[in-house]
Amino acid sequence: MMAEKGVWWSLQPFLDDEDAIPLREGSANRKKQIQMTAGTDTAYGLAKQHKVKTAWGTDTLFDPKLATRQGAQLAKLVRWYSPAEVLKMATADNAEMLALSGPRNPYPGKLGVVEQGALADLLLVEGDPIANIKLIEDPEKNFKVIMKDGKIY
């Protein structure tokens, strides 16, 4: 039904891995965490199977230490999607969803495309992230150029 109606689903992958909040084994919270990670697998699997419009989302940007892990978190989506689908989700697909915010949209131009008049922030990556998605895990090493608002960093 979500896919038929064009509903967007913004998910954050909660996995039982190095980025998970460490909880005491056997505790009630640990049991809930295990259920949540199983639910993450189910949610992404169903989204992919039914072609639901899926956006990349995270709340780690508010913590400077966790923010450095965003690329690694994004790369983990290859558990359900191809590297090309992951990169498209984080760029063009998210831009498509953000464009739906109408008058609350703070961006005066198009997002997620490289064309005249668009707000095209760019990353130049050392290597091919479609062949090796792990390149986006280490921006200090692999991002050779970061362009934001036309300014190169």
Where does each model-flagged region fall?
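Short, Lys/Arg- and Gly-enriched loop/turn segments at beta-strand edges
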Residues: 130-135
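A short helix-to-beta-strand connector/capping loop
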Residues: 5, 50-53, 142
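His/Asp/Glu-enriched, well-ordered alpha-helical/loop segment
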Residues: 37-129
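Active-site core of metal-dependent hydrolases
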Residues: 1-38, 55, 60-61, 126
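Short, small/polar residue-rich loop motifs at catalytic or cofactor-binding pockets
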Residues: 106-107, 139-141
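Short aromatic-centered micro-motifs
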Residues: 146
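Glycine-centered positions in the ABC transporter ATPase nucleotide-binding domain
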Residues: 149-150
